[in-house]
Structure formats: structure tokens, C-alpha cells
From Swiss-Prot:
Protein name: Lignin-forming anionic peroxidase
Group of enzyme by EC: oxidoreductase
Binding-site list for substrate: 166
Signal peptide coordinates: 1-27
Organism expressing this protein natively: Nicotiana sylvestris
Entry GO terms, CC: extracellular region
Keywords: Calcium, Disulfide bond, Glycoprotein, Heme, Hydrogen peroxide, Iron, Metal-binding, Oxidoreductase, Peroxidase, Pyrrolidone carboxylic acid, Secreted, Signal
Residue numbers marked as site, Transition state stabilizer: 65
Gene3D superfamilies: 1.10.520.10, Peroxidase, domain 2
A Pfam family assignment: peroxidase
Function: Removal of H(2)O(2), oxidation of toxic reductants, biosynthesis and degradation of lignin, suberization, auxin catabolism, response to environmental stresses such as wounding, pathogen attack and oxidative stress. These functions might be dependent on each isozyme/isoform in each plant tissue.
Co-factor note (free text): Binds 2 calcium ions per subunit. Binds 1 heme b (iron(II)-protoporphyrin IX) group per subunit.
Binding residues annotated for heme b, in chain numbering: 196
Subcellular location: Secreted
């Protein structure tokens, strides 16, 4: 029969093993993960991303958004890339992604090129994470060191995509809680929202705002947006999220908010007399502060619940399970 001391030691040993296992799981994400197994992986991904963005500047925003929508559902596991099958209800068909999520082909192209030099080594989850970083850099935004070693999921969740992703009509408190549930601070949330310095939105997402005659929108801005977004029909018409420099990653997005020229309701709530006004003001005055915080927040987002070690797989094709 174990004595109390022996029992305590046994429990302590088990706890230590569990703690070590957890630490090793996180330690498996490393910037040097592919240095020996696929040293040219990052250059190969960068080439694919740059080619895509040189053909269509908007693709930079699409790739950053794709990474964001991946990480917020099951973690950064490339689940958003999986196609519909009898056993997989694809996240592509979820309302936040249907008809708006783009860049799948770019990730597949990058994966195909990487497979040519290192078959079965680099995950789609890592390719998507690196592509988001390279997309930012390609349009004048910050770059950062990406930790690598994620593995790919064998499942997807349309349900979680429809419940966990923040929406364009969300009030500030819901945005804050949504990001907090993923381990991201309010400051992270505001910085990541700054990705709307590039990209476009469909008419039906901002129609109510520009026809509301509300006090939180500049009348001239609303009038300009109405030209391409009538009160009825033309739901898919696009408008830039940043009307001033729509293809350049900068801090004009925050300057627009101060002028009540945020396109989406979820943009303008960041500067509307609430707790995030001071952060928006700071970023509007300092492109350096925004750039630094955006990079830091992207790194944190890339750490959301990754599969590593023996968990998950390395997909051969990003849209399907091996």
C-alpha cells in the first residue's frame, strides 16, 4: 500500500509528464521546423503568393482573411480548405465564407510546388500561415517570423464556422468577447481589424449602414457608397474597405474610422465612443505602432490550437484528406 508521500510523488510525476508533454507540443512550432527537411519551402511559397498578388492585388486581402477564418474554427489546421464530401461538411459553405472566401487555388498551387521538392513534408496549415505573412509584405504591410510545424486536420466544421467567426454587424462587446475566446486581447482585435486597410466588401454587407442616415457615418461617404450599392439588388457589388488607399497596407483604415468612414458596421464600432477609441486614435497617428501590433497579433493568431507532433496529418492535396 502506498504511503501518502509515495502517492504525492506519483501524482507529482504524472503532473510533470503532462506539463512536459504540453510544453513539447508548443515547442514543436518553430521557425526552423523545415530547415533540414524542406529548406526551400518558404521561398517556394513566397514565389506563388507574389505571382498571385501581382496578377490581382486584392488577393493579398483574401489570403489574410482565409488564414483568419481558418484559425478561428478548430484552430490553424487548414480545415477551411477541405472540400465537401459525404463525411465532411465543408466550412467553405458556411455563411461567413460562402461566395466570399477566396484564395483556395493559390494555396493549392503553392502546395503543388512544395510537393515537387519535398513530398509529404509541409502541411497546408503552414502554407496558409506563411502565405498570409507573405501577402501582407507584398502590399507594403509588415512581415514577421512564422512559427512552423502545424499539421492538417482530417475534419472541418461548418457549424463552428457559423458560430465562431465574428460578423460584419457585430457590436463592439461581441467582437471583444469573440476574440477573447481565442486568446486574443482587445488590442489584438483592433490591430487585426486593420487588415481591412486592403480588400473589398459586398454591397449587402454594408447597405443598411449607408442608408441608415445614422450619426456614426459621414454623409458624403455614405452618398458616395450608394452609387455602387442601390437599396435593392446588386448584392454582390464590391466596394473597397479603405476608399483612400485600397491596395496599400497602411494605417488609413484607422484615419477613416475617425472620420466616420468605416465601411462595415463592425469597422465603425471600433471608434464610436467605446473602449477601443484610444487604440484607433493611436494607430491613426502611428503607422509604426499599427504595423508592429498587427504582426504580433498575427503571430498570436497563428498559435491558436495547432495540431502538431502525431496529431493530424500532412495532406497531399489541401482540399481533401489523404
Amino acid at each position: 500500500m502506498n504511503t501518502p508521500t509515495q502517492s504525492f510523488r506519483a501524482k507529482a510525476a504524472i503532473f510533470s509528464l503532462l506539463l512536459l508533454s504540453c510544453m513539447q507540443c508548443h515547442a514543436q512550432l518553430s521557425a526552423t521546423f523545415y530547415d533540414n527537411t524542406c529548406p526551400n519551402a518558404l521561398n517556394t511559397i513566397r514565389t506563388s503568393v507574389r505571382q498571385a498578388i501581382s496578377s490581382e492585388r486584392r488577393m493579398a486581402a483574401s489570403l489574410i482573411r482565409l488564414h483568419f477564418h481558418d484559425c478561428f474554427v478548430q484552430g490553424c489546421d487548414a480545415s477551411i480548405l477541405l472540400d465537401e464530401t459525404p463525411s465532411i461538411e465543408s466550412e467553405k459553405t458556411a455563411l461567413p465564407n460562402l461566395g466570399s472566401a477566396r484564395g483556395f487555388g493559390i494555396i493549392e498551387d503553392a502546395k503543388r510546388e512544395v510537393e515537387k521538392i519535398c513530398p509529404g513534408v509541409v502541411s497546408c496549415a503552414d502554407i496558409l500561415t506563411v502565405a498570409a505573412r507573405d501577402a501582407s509584405a507584398a502590399v507594403g504591410g509588415p512581415s514577421w517570423t512564422v512559427k512552423l510545424g502545424r499539421r492538417d486536420s482530417t475534419t472541418a466544421s461548418k457549424t463552428l464556422a457559423e458560430t465562431d467567426l465574428p460578423g460584419p454587424f457585430d457590436p463592439l462587446n461581441r467582437l471583444i468577447s469573440s476574440f477573447a475566446s481565442k486568446g486574443l486581447s482587445t488590442r489584438d482585435m483592433v490591430a487585426l481589424s486593420g487588415a481591412h486597410t486592403i480588400g473589398q466588401a459586398q454591397c449587402f454587407l454594408f447597405r443598411d449602414r449607408i442608408y441608415s442616415n445614422g450619426t456614426d457615418i459621414d454623409a458624403g461617404f455614405a452618398s458616395t457608397r450608394r452609387r455602387q450599392c442601390p437599396q435593392e439588388g446588386e448584392n454582390g457589388n464590391l466596394a473597397p474597405l479603405d476608399l483612400v488607399t485600397p491596395n496599400q497596407f497602411d494605417n488609413n483604415y484607422f484615419k477613416n474610422l475617425i472620420q466616420k468612414k468605416g465601411l462595415l458596421q463592425s469597422d465603425q464600432v471600433l471608434f464610436n465612443g467605446g473602449s477601443t477609441d484610444n487604440i484607433v486614435s493611436e494607430y491613426s497617428n502611428s503607422a509604426r505602432a499599427f504595423s508592429s501590433d498587427f504582426a504580433a497579433a498575427m503571430i498570436k493568431m497563428g498559435d491558436i490550437s495547432p495540431l502538431s507532433g502525431q496529431n493530424g496529418i500532412i495532406r497531399k492535396v489541401c482540399g481533401s484528406v489523404n
